[in-house]
């Protein structure tokens, strides 16, 4: 199973590897993709998937009874996004690079926080255990004392207890303010 929803949001002129590059896996491969991230069409519920041939009838039964079909306007918008130029994606990615660099530097400047440079999407996943808090504790304190909403790493796996996830799909001003608020929280 490969979730490739962020396949168009890779930084530094790198390409996201795809399981489609391994023909021997095709009969075991499920790929999920959509318009929500690359074309900023969240909420439109428009996407596509690739399944092994023998699973397609079962998937069709599941989908026809649970989501039926996407409305016509969303389908036409999806076609327009695919047929149109990629200028908007490129502009968005340029902005995300600036925001990524801002949050990366800002997180690493915080006492007890260690963050790797995000390679794609619009999330940073820093380790916060050196602050004296695990990810869940850090998130609660950030919400209540700094007014910053972040997600504990445990939402992404049991081995991520020491981490939190920040989104940098916000303005530079909001990112800077969030970092400043968390810095004040950590240095009280």
Please give the residue ranges for each predicted region.
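PLP-dependent class I/II
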Residues: 1-188
């Amino acid at each position: 199973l490969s979730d490739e929803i962020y396949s168009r949001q890779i930084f530094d002129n790198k390409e996201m590897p795809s399981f489609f590059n391994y023909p021997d896996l095709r009969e075991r491969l499920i790929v999920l993709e959509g318009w929500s991230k690359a074309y900023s069409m969240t909420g439109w519920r428009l996407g596509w998937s690739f399944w092994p041939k023998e699973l397609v009838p079962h998937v069709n039964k599941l989908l026809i009874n649970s989501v039926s079909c996407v409305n016509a306007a969303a389908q036409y918008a999806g076609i327009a996004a695919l047929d149109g130029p990629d200028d908007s994606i490129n502009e968005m990615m340029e902005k995300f690079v600036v925001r990524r660099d801002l949050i990366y530097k800002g997180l690493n400047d915080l006492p007890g926080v260690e963050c790797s440079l995000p390679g794609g999407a619009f999330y940073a996943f820093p380790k916060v255990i050196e602050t004296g808090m695990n990810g869940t504790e850090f998130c609660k304190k950030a919400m209540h004392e700094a007014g910053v909403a972040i997600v504990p790493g445990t939402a992404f796996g049991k081995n991520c207890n020491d981490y939190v996830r920040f989104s940098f799909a916000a303005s530079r001003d909001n990112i800077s303010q969030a970092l400043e608020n968390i810095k004040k929280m950590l240095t009280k």
